């Protein structure tokens, strides 16, 4: 599973050092549910600089909202998650 997690992150995520934010394209969320769940949890943990991952129930809800386009901007695990067109931008909460 770790191989698929890393491949999903490598192929579908761009890190901007100047803004310290991640840009996630739409293909990221078209992977199997477990791969999306684990890799998105890992990204939030990295950007939010947390030791523990976020709660699964909250993460499931956010992934569903992203897939159905019912999201504008929200926070989870010290990160701001916003959807712009077909991409999701993940940045650290100040």
Where do the language-model regions lie?
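AMP-forming adenylation/ATP pyrophosphatase catalytic core
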Residues: 1-94
